[in-house]
Amino acid sequence: MTTTKRLKFENLRIQFSNAIVGNFLRLPHSIINVLESTNYAIQEFGIAVHSHNSDIPIVHLGWDGHDSGSSENVVLINPVLATVYDLNQKSPLVDLYIQRYDHTHLATEVYVTPETSDDWEIIDANAMRFQNGEILHQTRIVTPGETLICYLEGIVTKFKIDRVEPSMKSARITDGSLVVVAPKVNKTRLVKAEYGHSNKTILKNGAIQLLKKVILRSTVCKMDFPKDNLFVVYISDGAQLPSQKGYASIVKCSLRQSKKSDSDNKSVGIPSKKIGVFIKCDSQIPENHIALSSHLWDAFFTHPMNGAKIKLEFLQMNQANIISGRNATVNIKYFGKDVPTKSGDQYSKLLGGSLLTNNLILPTEQIIIEIKKGESEQQLCNLNEISNESVQWKVTQMGKEEVKDIIERHLPKHYHVKETGEVSRTSKDEDDFITVNSIKKEMVNYLTSPIIATPAIILDGKQGIGKTRLLKELINEVEKDHHIFVKYADCETLHETSNLDKTQKLIMEWCSFCYWYGPSLIVLDNVEALFGKPQANDGDPSNNGQWDNASKLLNFFINQVTKIFNKDNKRIRVLFSGKQKTQINPLLFDKHFVSETWSLRAPDKHARAKLLEYFFSKNQIMKLNRDLQFSDLSLETEGFSPLDLEIFTEKIFYDLQLERDCDNVVTRELFSKSLSAFTPSALRGVKLTKETNIKWGDIGALANAKDVLLETLEWPTKYEPIFVNCPLRLRSGILLYGYPGCGKTLLASAVAQQCGLNFISVKGPEILNKFIGASEQNIRELFERAQSVKPCILFFDEFDSIAPKRGHDSTGVTDRVVNQLLTQMDGAEGLDGVYILAATSRPDLIDSALLRPGRLDKSVICNIPTESERLDILQAIVNSKDKDTGQKKFALEKNADLKLIAEKTAGFSGADLQGLCYNAYLKSVHRWLSAADQSEVVPGNDNIEYFSINEHGRREENRLRLKTLLQQDVVHETKTSTSAASELTAVVTINDLLEACQETKPSISTSELVKLRGIYDRFQKDRNGEMPNGENSIDIGSRLSLM
């Protein structure tokens, strides 16, 4: 059955059934069999009910899919619906015409009007249930001019169908259709406002006739409005102007649930007031748009915004005699707490060139404008074409009760009255924006594209990285340059998100706003607070319920946005912002709601210089010394986020205030002092090493390895202007391999100190985890940590234990680690500022894929030192200095010949030579201690000879006192000699070194040396780079791998 053909069934009787809820029929079994044979869905059938042998339909209904259960010629209908169309069980027979309504007969929008004001109040009281689709569930076929019924909480409401979009005689609605209800208010129940809100066009002096009415979309443009004309609007330059004067009013959003109060019973959908305006044209205004002056927005009690529906009514040109301000009296009623701040002459200058409207309230000026001509009020007063002398200006102070009434009944919530009586409007934060990231342009281009795959995108980045600041910059641009309405919400500040009904109501309000004011953009900052990722609840049922609510809310949000998006691709866009993409509910991605993801990283040095200059400029007291530049400071603040830079700038300011005689000039010393005491957020909790206490000169030999490390790690940072223009990808990975104890780990530790890079050391147990996915997560977090503190060296010691060849692990853990390493080291993002340094003694055990270009680009051997290299190592050991005192750690006699020791230590590694020196040092210590034990000690002496004059019997007492004094002198002398001995240093002689050389043996045996030499030779020459074929070995004793 095609859409143009109809099935006709005659001579059917009508019966009532309360089981039918809505605008449906139930058909007899004979008709159902015919419809089921067509293989079309029951939702696609529409039924036209005709009187028998009549061509005029009574009503168009849908089929609810049930059998009437009666005789073959009976159809069932809801009794209330039957009453509407005067159908009863005693009515004559009816005929049914059944037609298929396919996708070409779908209505996107249906405009209806309640039959009575009671119906409207029922809808208003049950707006949530109505908006959640009650009418869509109870209706399938809509026809202009017919009546619908809808059950809300058991109460029946009736609607008249005004029109459908796209226009057609009869159409089918689905879950994606929008039903727009025009309010119908009982006028006798309205409380008439004393001031303003007048929609009449009939005056006592005569009638103001309207030429034309248009509804335009408001836009916030960067325009210079005339200062002498407060109430002016600009429309598109291509529009024809029937008149240069007219009324402007805002059409309230009819999709939003009205909020009634005792002081304001106005209904949504009715213009709040009409204000007389001058109408001008400008080429900056897009077609079908209108720009309003700031005073006009203020008179509407509304923030300047995009998307508001502005009703513009043009006045006839020959009405000048009616709206003339000649001989008029303008009474300015001041409702501030204090006396009026301006005189009549000042108000004359402020309002003199405008078109004034009677009883107009200007909240920020705290005045009400009243216009009279003689004894009667005048609705409009044109002061632009007459002199101020022909107008009488009066300023009066309103009483306290009148002021209180105005504030309670007329001023919206975003206006507040201060204790001084001043009325102000809470406005948006208008910061001075500074663009430091290029991804804003990419995001704006994507969001403003006419066609995109899905409506949502995600911006992620760590806390303090600048997401909210970037969002504000983006919102400012799309509002000013692209005329898009933006609804911004910080999900962390939302209350009662655990209450499903209240949050659904809030989401419905967002979507209603965006549909009405569209094209629009919903920006949800910190989205993980509202749509977080479900986590393991460990048996806690309450936690499970909370996550279940979060998923329900997200599903509800996706469905609401998708409905609008499917109707009009340009109507709505969504931008999510969160700390990590993995913390957001995966339902967003499972339903393919998000199409693109942008990640915000720490600013580079140019952006940091720009930010530092911006934060310094905000603090007008500080200034840099002449020898400092912001580009120099940016090099010292690698890894700082914008928030870190802002806090750091404040710290510099406070440190500056503690200095005396500084003239508020930031010097190099002050900056370094503040920097050393500040830790950026990216480094908090990170095991980071920047001072390894191992200097380049502490390592002997290994000249080739040192050169390669400096070329790879130091040069790109030191000579950045040269390397930044390199057309090829720079080397970022080095493998140090060689015999045990030959300085691989020592080199890695010293290179960070030499090149001034951050250093993160990684050990196998910190990464490997038996649980699937845990090891990979550790690798990802490790690289993210290194990226946040770049330039950084990521050092993997004993790399063969972390990334062995795949297919030889019984648990499969290291296989997954290798796969993740391959992705991170040579992924699409690359490693900008992160260098990989790996050390191993068995390079043959490392997976060959990691040794290819783009990963570990260069392999450097740390070989067994030759005689000259051993001499170099010995000299480095004995010449090493203490970091704190600057003195040599190793005291060697002056005439010692280290070349002799180098000749006798063939086959020794660097670690062996260091151990030999330590053994020699111990021998010198033993020799020094033996010499110290033989030091002189002053003996005691009991035979003391002395003489005394006039002792008078006190001889023995004096002898004992003298003995005590002498013993104290002996103790002091012993202590002094011991203190002097402690300052001596054990000196290592050549004999100590020779004895230690005889006692020390190489740590690498001859057989092990031969084995390793063969491995390294094959690694250097015969390595073919072949990977395992993935097949398990079938040899006896081989292990299986969990792949």
Swiss-Prot record:
Changing residue 798 to Q: Abolished ATPase activity of the PEX1-PEX6 AAA ATPase complex. Keywords: ATP-binding, Cytoplasm, Hydrolase, Membrane, Nucleotide-binding, Peroxisome, Peroxisome biogenesis, Protein transport, Repeat, Transport. The keyword Nucleotide-binding applies. It is found in: Cytoplasm, Cytosol; Peroxisome membrane. It catalyses: ATP + H2O = ADP + phosphate + H(+). The keyword Cytoplasm applies. GO terms for molecular function: ATP binding; ATP hydrolysis activity; protein transporter activity. PANTHER family: AAA-FAMILY ATPASE (PTHR23077), PEROXISOMAL ATPASE PEX1 (PTHR23077:SF12). This is Peroxisomal ATPase PEX1. It comes from Saccharomyces cerevisiae (strain ATCC 204508 / S288c).
